């Protein structure tokens, strides 16, 4: 199967633009090729589970990633091996199982034995379930993990993660209460220490306190405690923090309006307060504080009115000065930013154009073709600092030329045109950038997670990274000339050259040398605009270009590294990269350096495009693209951001969303038909944010809810019975609503047109026809709720029924009857 994006229409090159898929006789995906990348191979066992895979970079090294399952179908071991292609292909003839043996035997001495012969296996992940017998195994015994006192049947109890870039491992264990909530977690650290988290819950499952103890191999220890308070609606109202023997600090205090929207934030016992205002559509319109204020305009203000949620203009004031700064914005018909015109004063007519940022064009894949950027050129002068022309090989950047003759003054951002060659950038078989001659980068090496492990510069300087097998950054090492700086990330404790220097908090950080608190004051995108100390004094002021570059007028912006979107900025040796966790971002070019892991949900967009060309309205929150709202023990509505992974959450609604994601993803991979893809996309994609709330009336998606961010309303035991008798589980219903959310986020204009009532005589709307005939059929089939050739329905009718669980399509007759008595069940348009 071929998917040909818009770029193919102008340049019909399958290798550069096409998405290519091949399936076996069981309709399982066995071959996948992304644009500009080498193909990936997938191999399944007789139980239709993925047991081997291989991308282009792994093929160069003759490596095959492998997956071993237990008898319950849970992944117990992941790693890479050197099996021959012929041997790997025979895996489909058997069911690959991992058996837990006694003692330090098997794969990486984990105790697991695989029924498949693995040649030179290198283990990356080991998972233990149900019991704590692993405590005495190799590696765990050194950390004195305690025995569990409550049954953990069905739960992940322990894990081993390798550290990519070293020979070490991270050992961890989770302990549960009788309600299957994690009450204690222990994890070893890369510096030889240990982190322990102990959580106390309210009756409703909300955390009341979290006690964190951190130690390292030198004997240093730190203890901190968070205490949480909620109002009658279970909304978080107070967060207190204490570390070591220091006095407790009221870190955060929240107040809400009558609609449940955040109205006021206070920091550090009220030394700094921020007020928020909204319009009738719940879109944020202003942030007001003494050190930072911002007004956002949509249909009013100085720019061209935008009625679709785009911000037409914004004005802000930061720090101690009284200068009003701002931009008015212009967008094209695809909601991509084309021009940001800077000005000062209340109507932005003073000092105009000083910091403009203009995108001079996009290609059909939304790759930026050119950028004009103005900035400060001397102590008193301003002018054009970048006039970029960008050329591509498919979606991959080939070269950049800068026609501007001015350079930026001070500490601002601009593009450094280091060379003038036909090919200034190179990429590997997975689409990762391996060379940037303009930054004098000769080589970038990547690990098997497509995360950078080593950057080598022309002058001999080196930056290296250490990650665990989940992709969490553990260490950064900068070798700049004769100076070496090692930064260790031990949870929220930051070390530099072995010395603990910072303790990150929910509102900023503590400098450990003087025990002082520092707070981030943020704008609507989570950009850190101002840093204030515990007395409310301004320590840092940051002003940003729309795509994230720092303006030269920023003040003391080297105080701390967390800037745009709250992400860590590395400026050493001219790197100027933001670390978003899954990928690195270059704000001077408005591009990523690696392929979007969810690019297959955005065929019309380049996998390197940042925020779909709209950095004013969209953010990349570390992949935490699903924000799940729930009521905690105090009845307060709080949120939990989830980006995937095998996580157990104490709140039952949050856990049900996680279960739906895991179920849809696993069955979609097993079926190889694209089932569950919408659920996976909204959870894992780095460019979108979707809220999930517990339904009261019906399962649905509302694009105007949650300040215009959109919200899925869903209940974990509400399935859907069609008029032909077919029942879809709540998990399948969730994917239906996720597809609506995904279309709203990625194809807004068409979504708004197609969801008009009456636009389709059979399915009520064209949008419902698209979802019902597409993702609903795939997910229902993948989840075993419909057979091959069978359809869920041929209309938009459906009746809510109570099922026996998130993943069940078996109707609970008694509860359904009770529900129907209360609600007078009717055939509705949702789900």
Where are these regions (language model features)?
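A motif-centric feature for acidic-aromatic and gly/ser/thr-rich catalytic loops and repeats
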Residues: 2-3, 8, 203, 293-300, ...
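Beta-turn initiation residues at beta-strand->coil junctions
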Residues: 2-8, 25, 31-37, 46, ...
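Aromatic-rich beta-strand edge motifs centered on tyrosine
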Residues: 15-28, 40-49, 65-74, 89-107, ...
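Short alpha-helical catalytic segment bearing the HExxH-like zincin motif
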Residues: 580-583, 726-738
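Active-site scaffold of zinc-dependent metalloenzymes
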Residues: 691-731, 741-745
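Active-site or metal-binding loop neighborhoods of secreted/extracellular toxin and effector enzymes
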Residues: 749-831
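Catalytic Zn2+-binding segment of zinc metalloproteases
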Residues: 737-753
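Short turn/helix-capping motifs enriched in Asx and small/polar residues
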Residues: 111-113, 535-552, 573-575, 581-583, ...
């Amino acid at each position: 199967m071929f998917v040909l994006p818009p770029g193919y229409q102008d340049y019909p090159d399958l290798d550069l633009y096409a998405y290519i898929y091949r399936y076996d006789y069981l309709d399982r995906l066995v071959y996948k090729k992304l644009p500009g990348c080498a193909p990936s191979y997938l191999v399944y066992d007789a139980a239709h589970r993925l047991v081997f895979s291989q991308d282009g970079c792994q093929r160069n090294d003759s490596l095959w990633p492998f997956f071993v399952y237990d008898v319950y179908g849970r992944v117990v071991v992941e790693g890479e091996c050197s099996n021959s292609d012929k041997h790997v292909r025979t895996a489909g003839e058997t069911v690959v199982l991992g058996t837990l043996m006694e003692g330090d035997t098997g794969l990486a001495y984990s105790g697991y034995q695989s029924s498949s012969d693995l040649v030179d296996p290198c283990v990356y992940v080991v998972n233990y379930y149900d019991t704590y017998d692993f405590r005495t195994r190799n590696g765990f015994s050194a950390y004195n993990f305690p025995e569990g006192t409550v049954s953990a049947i069905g739960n992940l109890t322990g894990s081993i993660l390798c550290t990519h870039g070293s020979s070490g491992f991270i050992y961890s264990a989770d302990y549960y209460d009788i309600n299957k909530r994690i009450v204690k977690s222990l994890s070893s650290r890369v510096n030889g220490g240990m982190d322990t988290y102990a959580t106390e819950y309210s009756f409703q499952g909300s955390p009341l306190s979290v006690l964190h103890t951190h130690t390292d191999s030198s004997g240093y220890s730190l203890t901190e405690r968070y205490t949480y308070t909620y109002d009658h609606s279970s909304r978080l109202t107070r967060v207190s923090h204490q570390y070591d023997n220091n006095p407790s600090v009221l870190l955060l205090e929240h107040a809400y309006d009558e609609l449940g929207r955040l109205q006021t934030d206070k920091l550090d016992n009220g030394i700094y307060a921020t007020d928020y205002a909204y319009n009738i559509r719940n879109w944020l319109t202003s942030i007001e504080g003494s050190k930072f204020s911002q007004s956002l305009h949509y249909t009013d203000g100085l720019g061209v009115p935008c009625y679709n949620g785009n911000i037409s203009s914004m004005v802000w004031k930061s720090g101690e000065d009284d200068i009003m700064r701002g931009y008015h914005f212009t967008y094209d018909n695809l909601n991509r930013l084309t021009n940001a015109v800077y000005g000062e004063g209340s109507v932005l007519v003073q000092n105009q154009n000083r910091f403009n940022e203009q995108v001079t064009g996009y290609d059909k894949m939304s790759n930026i073709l050119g950028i004009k950027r103005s900035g400060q050129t001397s102590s008193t002068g301003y002018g054009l600092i970048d006039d970029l022309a960008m050329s591509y090989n498919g979606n991959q950047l080939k070269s950049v030329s800068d026609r501007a003759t001015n350079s930026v003054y001070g500490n601002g951002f601009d593009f450094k045109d280091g060379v003038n060659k036909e090919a200034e950038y190179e990429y590997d078989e997975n689409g990762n950038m391996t060379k940037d001659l303009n930054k004098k980068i000769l080589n970038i090496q990547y690990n098997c997670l497509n995360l950078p492990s080593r950057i080598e510069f022309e002058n001999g300087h080196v930056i290296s990274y250490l990650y665990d097998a989940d992709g969490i950054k553990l260490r950064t090492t900068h070798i700049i000339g004769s100076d070496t700086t090692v930064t260790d990330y031990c949870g929220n404790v930051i070390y530099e050259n072995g010395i603990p220097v910072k303790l990150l908090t929910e509102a900023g950080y503590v400098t450990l040398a003087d025990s002082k608190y520092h707070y981030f004051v943020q704008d609507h995108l989570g950009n850190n605009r101002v840093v204030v100390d515990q007395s409310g004094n301004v320590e840092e002021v940051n002003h940003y270009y729309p795509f994230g570059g720092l303006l030269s007028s920023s003040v003391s912006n080297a105080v701390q590294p967390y800037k745009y979107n709250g992400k860590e900025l590395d400026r050493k040796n001219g790197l100027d990269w933001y670390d978003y966790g899954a990928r690195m971002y270059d704000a001077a070019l408005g591009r990523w350096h690696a392929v979007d892991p969810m690019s297959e949900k955005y065929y019309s967009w380049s996998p390197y495009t940042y925020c779909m060309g709209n950095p004013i309205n969209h953010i990349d929150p570390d992949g935490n693209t699903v924000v799940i709202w729930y009521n905690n023990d105090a009845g307060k509505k709080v949120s939990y951001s989830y980006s995937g992974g095998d996580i157990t959450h104490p709140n039952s609604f949050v856990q049900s969303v996680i279960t739906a994601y895991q179920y849809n993803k696993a069955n979609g991979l097993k079926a190889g038909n694209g089932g569950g893809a919408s659920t996976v996309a909204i959870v894992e994609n780095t460019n979108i944010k979707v809220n999930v709330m517990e339904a009261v009336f019906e399962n649905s998606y509302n694009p105007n809810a949650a300040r215009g961010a959109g919200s899925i309303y869903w209940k974990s035991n509400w399935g859907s019975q069609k008029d032909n008798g077919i029942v879809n589980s709540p998990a399948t219903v969730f994917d239906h609503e996720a597809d609506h959310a995904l279309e709203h986020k990625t194809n807004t204009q068409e979504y708004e047109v197609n969801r008009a009532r009456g636009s389709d005589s059979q399915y009520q709307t064209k949008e419902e026809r698209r979802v019902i005939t597409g993702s609903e059929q795939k997910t229902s089939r993948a989840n075993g709720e419909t057979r091959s050739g069978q359809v869920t329905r041929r209309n938009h009718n459906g009746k809510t029924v109570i099922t026996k669980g998130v993943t069940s399509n078996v109707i609970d007759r008694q509860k359904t009857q009770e529900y129907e008595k209360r609600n007078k069940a009717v055939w509705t348009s949702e789900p």
